[in-house]
């Protein structure tokens, strides 16, 4: 790790001394981006999170900003080195509720937008989520974990006064007892609360040994709630079987609105208070199914699916302010689109420039909302800059309102990103991919190439900003990233080709992508490199077990042994039941055949492992198995462990820099050098 940090500092010093026009590692601290836009009830203004980096504390921070829907009068609502978010504008547009997180914890606040007065509503022991204003403006609802009594095993005698005994044993009787990014989970259940918006004690309105941690929506008369939870026997072993319930706040009665096998969530009440929308599907125990959009009466009767022919997952559906249709987003061929559907099922696409939520890798995804006059706002981005705020009205053309990173990115030469297609060598299936070439790319040169593979595996890359891709290109590499079979945004059949079959022919897809780029020229075929994280780490380890074509590889936060993974990952009940047709003790060879460790005897490629020390999604012992196997075989290898990092290995700015620095150093050690070997 020390050599990685020294390399980071060397990069920083070199970038400063030479004033490079390319993106430099320290520029990560200068990036700003937008998130979570919220449109006011009259459509006149938008509240959003303005995200930035804190170089002294090495943290991502966020404040709330306000901007008029025409782009004027941008100004901060909150300031400081804190994390303000989850903004919800009150029904009259005069107040905004939000959470503010500091080192002391996260609490709920209400701020008056005209005068700036701020009321701290809560002093709670746990963070809150899913804020929702009542239509009359008198209440706020939210989710929060309520502690339960921890199990014990045996009793100890009382320690003498002043004695310093060891901590008592920790007893686990839950299937999910720790989670990535959170560590060991406290004993308890997520419940729904309501609190007076003017101040007062929160009141718990759900109960039982069940989690109620999904969306919350108020009834039109502000006397009831629609909540989401898993209220079934053995709920923790059936993690996708959520339902929607109605809670009467006067009497406390709870009534099921949905009752089927599948993940119903995202409930919202129509502006006239007469109908519901939500998304979900009938669960068939597949590793991927597209989410579908439903509308129904308030009691769940007369349910119908609005877009049965849309072979894409519906995300974040919201009622239009006139109640005549629904806005939603969906991923399509790597891009994230905003669309409107009428209650008769007519689909209208509005924009395909949504994105920019991430900084590290070019994943699809976005955030949007709708307010009065059907004014919508969304996070807008592309491959050359992270998220800004765009807005429009109805189904009209949106306009980008902010340019948060202009001061930095207008003064950096970034790598342009080109979209391409290739036929897979396995079956001729069309595979979409993108190529980022250095800003000073010379077609007559011969460049090293990095194949960067996304995780998931059911996710998608697209033409979105990626600091990692830009830093690799700034170091002189051509970077290629693709959506092999199994990726989302191409329909259910494309994603389901790897169901109980991962990794498999996705290998052929990726090799075909590399072949296509090499065939175009300007690539040195003797300097090919491969890396990927999570599911991309699985495929990277699989690739070096199938071919010695790549000069070096970096396997980040992988699964190496499916038998150990499905029984020790944080969400074991899901992985064990949805990713394999049988349990590992019932079909050990089925798990082993798909494990990269089964191919380690073939590996000759110098391969580095890189994982966060607090990763509970693909735990460190997965990387350690591959590392030790390579060591025993005499293959050049190294194990980079990121202290304090979870599966989101680059969540802190310096961790992102350290990850990129380690990968570049490993490739440079093995002939990459990031240099263009001129053909002349």
Q: Model segments located where?
A:
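Multi-bladed beta-propeller domains
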Residues: 19-34, 59-60, 67-83, 100, ...
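Beta-strand C-termini and the immediately following turn/loop, strongest in propeller blades
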Residues: 47-56, 96-103, 141-147, 180-186, ...
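Beta-strand-rich domains and repeat architectures in extracellular enzymes and scaffolds
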Residues: 26-62
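Cap/lid segment of the alpha/beta-hydrolase catalytic domain
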Residues: 232-233, 284, 404-526, 533, ...
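Active-site-proximal cap/loop segments of hydrolase catalytic domains
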Residues: 468, 481-680
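Hydrophobic or amphipathic alpha-helical targeting/insertion segments
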Residues: 95-154
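Blade-terminus and WD-like Trp-Asp/Gly-His loop motifs, strongest in beta-propeller folds
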Residues: 38-45, 86-95, 131-139, 216-224, ...
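Predominantly five- to eight-bladed beta-propeller fold
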Residues: 61-62, 145-195, 228, 238-243, ...
């Amino acid at each position: 790790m020390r050599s990685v940090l020294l390399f980071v500092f060397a990069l920083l010093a070199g970038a400063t001394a030479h004033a490079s026009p390319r993106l430099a590692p320290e520029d990560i601290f200068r990036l700003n981006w937008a998130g979570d836009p919220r449109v006011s009830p009259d459509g006149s203004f938008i509240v959003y999170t303005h995200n930035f980096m804190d170089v002294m504390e090495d943290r991502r921070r966020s404040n709330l900003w306000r901007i008029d829907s025409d782009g004027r009068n941008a100004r901060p609502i909150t300031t400081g080195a804190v994390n303000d978010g989850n903004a919800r504008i009150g029904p009259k547009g005069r107040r905004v509720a939000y959470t503010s997180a500091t080192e002391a914890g996260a609490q709920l606040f209400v701020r008056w937008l005209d005068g700036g007065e701020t009321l701290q509503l809560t002093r709670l022991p746990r963070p809150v989520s899913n804020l929702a204003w009542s239509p009359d403006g008198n209440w706020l609802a939210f989710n929060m974990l309520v502690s339960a009594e921890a199990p014990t095993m045996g009793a100890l005698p009382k320690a003498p006064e002043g004695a310093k005994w060891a901590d008592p044993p920790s007893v686990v009787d839950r299937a999910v007892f720790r989670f990535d990014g959170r560590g060991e989970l406290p004993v308890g259940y997520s419940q729904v609360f309501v609190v007076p918006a003017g101040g007062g004690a929160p009141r718990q309105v759900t109960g039982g040994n069940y989690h109620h941690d999904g969306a919350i929506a108020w009834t039109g008369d502000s006397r009831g709630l629609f909540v989401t939870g898993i209220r079934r026997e053995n709920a923790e072993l059936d993690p996708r079987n959520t339902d929607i319930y109605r809670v009467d706040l006067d009497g406390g009665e709870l009534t099921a609105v949905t009752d089927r096998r599948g993940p119903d969530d995202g409930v919202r009440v129509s502006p006239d208070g007469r109908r519901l929308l939500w998304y979900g599907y009938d669960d068939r125990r597949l590793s991927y199914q597209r989410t579908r959009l439903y509308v129904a009466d308030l009691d769940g009767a007369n349910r119908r699916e609005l877009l049965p022919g849309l072979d894409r997952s519906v995300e974040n559906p919201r009622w239009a302010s006139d109640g005549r249709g629904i806005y939603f987003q969906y991923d399509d061929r790597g891009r994230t689109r905003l669309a409107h559907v009428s209650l008769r099922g007519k689909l209208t696409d509005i924009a395909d420039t949504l994105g920019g939520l991430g900084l590290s890798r070019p994943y699809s995804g976005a955030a949007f909302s709708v307010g009065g006059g059907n004014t919508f706002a969304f996070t807008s981005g592309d491959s050359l800059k992270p998220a800004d705020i765009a807005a429009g009205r109805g189904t009209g053309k949106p306009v980008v309102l902010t340019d948060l990173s202009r001061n930095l990115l207008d003064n950096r030469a970034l790598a342009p990103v080109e979209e391409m297609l290739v036929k897979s060598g396995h079956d001729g299936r069309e595979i979409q991919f993108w190529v980022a070439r250095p800003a000073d790319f010379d077609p007559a040169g011969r460049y090293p190439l990095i194949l960067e593979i996304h995780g998931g595996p059911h996710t998608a890359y697209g033409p979105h900003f990626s600091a990692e891709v830009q830093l690799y290109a700034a170091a002189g590499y051509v970077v290629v990233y693709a959506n092999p079979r199994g990726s989302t945004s191409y329909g259910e059949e494309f994603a389901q080709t790897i169901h109980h079959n991962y990794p498999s022919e996705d290998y052929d897809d990726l090799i075909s992508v590399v072949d296509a780029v090499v065939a175009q020229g300007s690539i040195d075929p003797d300097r090919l490199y491969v890396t990927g994280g999570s599911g991309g780490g699985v495929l990277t380890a699989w690739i070096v077990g199938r071919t010695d074509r790549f000069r070096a590889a970096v396997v980040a936060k992988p699964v190496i042994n499916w038998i150990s993974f499905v029984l020790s990952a944080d969400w074991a009940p899901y992985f064990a039941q949805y990713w394999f047709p049988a349990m590992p003790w019932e079909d050990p060879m089925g798990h082993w055949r798909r494990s990269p460790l089964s191919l380690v005897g073939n590996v000759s490629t110098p391969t580095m492992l890189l994982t966060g020390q607090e990763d509970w999604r693909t735990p460190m012992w997965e990387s350690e198995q591959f590392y030790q196997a390579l060591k025993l075989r005499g293959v050049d290898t190294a194990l980079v462990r990121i202290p304090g990092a979870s599966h989101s290995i680059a969540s802190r700015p310096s961790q992102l820099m350290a990850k990129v620095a380690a990968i570049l150093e490993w490739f440079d050690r093995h002939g990459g050098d990031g240099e263009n070997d001129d053909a002349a």
